[in-house]
Amino acid sequence: LTIGFARRAATYKRAHLIFYDMEKLLEIGKGNIQIIFSGKAHPKDMSGKGIIRNIVQSAKKFDGKIKIIYLENYDMWLGRLITSGVDLWLNTPQRPNEASGTSGMKAALNGIPNFSILDGWWAEGCRDEQNGWAIGNHEALGDEKDALDLYSKLQSQIILGVRQKYL
């Protein structure tokens, strides 16, 4: 299962959420998933640049047990490749900060199911277990609860579905 996460590197987008509990991610992801990250930070956004560094450092800690890559030089061409070439689109913004979530829209237009916080367009577009999966509910739950729901659904619904040829 190839998971994609590509967009502007901004703190509210919480690219790091999937790494909240690295042991749990390894437990459910080893041999089951690979993750492709990409994005850019504004040149003056030190926090955004830090997010990219943290993703790269976190990926190294898995030592190949889960394949994780950060593709540099994100642009429209690379975004098109990623949003059409993954099996699942991950979107984990802090509610209620996502204005629209165009990367998830692009993935959906390419037939890629979304796995997302109910914010931006996904708050209205989500048909849980039909066109993707919701992480959490319509309330801002915080990193811990969102991460626990992410891991639970990834393991019990999404990966299991792939094994059963659901996706």
Residue ranges and their predicted role:
Residues 3-5, 35-37, 55, 68-71, ...:
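Generic structural hydrophobic/aromatic packing signal, biased to beta-strands
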Residues 1-74, 165:
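Conserved catalytic-core segment of nucleotide-activated headgroup transferases in glycan assembly
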Residues 15-17, 46-49, 79-81, 101-104, ...:
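A short acidic (Asp/Glu
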Residues 47, 51-54, 78, 146, ...:
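Alpha-helical structural motif
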Residues 1, 54-105:
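Donor nucleotide-activated moiety binding/catalytic core segment of transferases
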Residues 26, 83-167:
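Catalytic binding pocket for nucleotide-activated donors in carbohydrate/polymer assembly enzymes
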